[in-house]
C-alpha cells in the first residue's frame, strides 16, 4: 500500500498548507481529499508536489507492504 504520511511531514517542515498546494501547484481540492484518504493520484500530481515542496518522491510517499494480501499466482 502507498502511504502519503511523508507528504504531511514534509509539508509541516516546509511550512506549507493544503492552500499552498492549491495556489502554487494548482492541486485541486478533490486531489487533496484523495491524498488525505490515501487514494491513488496521478504521477503528474506527484511531480507537482515534488516541485511545489522542492523535494523528492521519497519525501512524499512511502511503500508499506500489505502483509494480509495473498500472494499473486505465478502465472
What are these model-predicted stretches?
Residues 15-33:
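Short alpha-helical DNA-recognition segment
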Amino acid at each position: 500500500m502507498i502511504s502519503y504520511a511523508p507528504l504531511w511531514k514534509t509539508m509541516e517542515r516546509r511550512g506549507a498548507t493544503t492552500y499552498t498546494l492549491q495556489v502554487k501547484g494548482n492541486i485541486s481540492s478533490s486531489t487533496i481529499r484523495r491524498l488525505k484518504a490515501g487514494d491513488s493520484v496521478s504521477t503528474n500530481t506527484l511531480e507537482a508536489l515534488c516541485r511545489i515542496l522542492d523535494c523528492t518522491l521519497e519525501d512524499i510517499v512511502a511503500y508499506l507492504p500489505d502483509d494480509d494480501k495473498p500472494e499473486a499466482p505465478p502465472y
